[in-house]
């Protein structure tokens, strides 16, 4: 870790000491469902949808017994009918292969329909308290702009951040980067003028943020988000 990276992580911790998940969930099943729904959708929208979902489908067994056609009206405002199909299919696999219990390993989670490394990492970190570094669109964008990573994919970004940041801080750093991405380091118009990280930021110092580059970065972000 170089001096700039150390300053950036310290400042992120100072800025967002109480950063935490903004999705509402209370157990591994709810974490899995909410995270699948959150792909390319705001947490606020997901939080509006999930109370009815969890009321009528309170556990893996109930979800496995329904159909995508029944579930879809509950979640259609979150976009993509594939989300309903994947949620039902994932719960059926959990019933059949894992005794109705959401698995707690990366290998098992990513074997579920519609579950990629990001979704699996969220479940591991926030449902099971296991070390994981979920990389969503905000983490990918902000970490690469700041110089905490230098990668063309979410998978590379995940590996680089895990190598850079102490394991005990992975989940916290995930939230620091999300908070900063939502509040300051926006995708299209980053508020560099009010960013206290500017003195150490690679993008700010090299004038990396420009419309053409950001268009390509957003394309990469969308590809990564679509892959869960």
Which residues does each predicted region cover?
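Catalytic cores of DNA base-excision repair glycosylases
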Residues: 2-215
């Amino acid at each position: 870790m170089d001096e700039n990276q150390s300053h950036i992580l310290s400042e992120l911790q100072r800025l967002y000491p109480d950063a935490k998940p903004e999705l509402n969930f209370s157990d591994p099943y709810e974490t899995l469902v909410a995270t699948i729904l959150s792909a390319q959708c705001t947490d606020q929208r997901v939080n509006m949808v999930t109370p009815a979902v969890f009321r009528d489908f309170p556990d893996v067994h109930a979800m496995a017994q329904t159909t995508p056609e029944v579930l879809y009206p509950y979640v259609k405002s979150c976009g993509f009918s594939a989300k309903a199909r994947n949620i039902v299919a994932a719960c059926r696999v959990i019933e059949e292969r894992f005794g109705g219990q959401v698995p707690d390993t990366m290998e098992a989670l990513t074997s579920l329909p519609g579950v990629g490394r990001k979704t699996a990492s969220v479940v591991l970190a926030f449902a099971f308290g296991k070390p994981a570094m979920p990389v969503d669109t905000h983490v990918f964008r902000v970490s690469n702009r700041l110089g905490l990573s230098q990668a063309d994919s979410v998978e590379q970004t995940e590996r680089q951040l895990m190598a850079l940041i102490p394991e005990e801080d992975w989940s916290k750093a995930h939230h620091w980067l999300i908070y900063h991405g939502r509040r300051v380091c926006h995708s299209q118009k980053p508020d560099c003028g009010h960013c206290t990280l500017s003195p150490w930021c690679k993008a700010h110092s090299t004038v990396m943020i420009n419309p053409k580059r950001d268009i390509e970065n957003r394309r990469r972000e969308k590809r990564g988000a679509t892959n869960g």
